[in-house]
A protein has these predicted regions:
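A compositional/biophysical signature of low hydrophobicity enriched in polar/charged and small residues
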Residues: 1-90
Length: 90
């Protein structure tokens, strides 16, 4: 079946303290659907790349990982419509 649905989620955290941030990142790293996590500068704190089986999986994960997490102040989901380049080689 694979994971054909790709989502990019930007996350603003409520608590930027070292221990809260480390715990939140540790929780994210355990999820099979999450392929990449980046701490970034700017209006958001973190960018999470997800590879999902379907929208139902996204809804379950986004509710559990983002909406119900007290340390997540705000999140926005973007879905990949077309992939034009994907190359991880240096």
């Amino acid at each position: 079946m694979g994971r054909p649905l790709k989502a990019i989620v930007t996350v603003k955290l409520a608590d930027h303290g070292v221990s809260a941030r480390k715990q939140w990142l540790a929780d994210m790293k355990t999820e099979a659907a999450i392929s990449q996590i980046y701490s970034v500068s700017g209006e958001t704190d973190t960018v999470v790349m997800m590879n999902l089986t379907d929208m139902e999986e996204f809804q379950e994960l986004s509710q559990r990982l983002f909406a119900e997490d007290e340390n997540v102040l705000q999140y926005q989901s973007l879905f990949v419509l077309e992939q034009h380049k994907f190359d991880l080689a240096l």
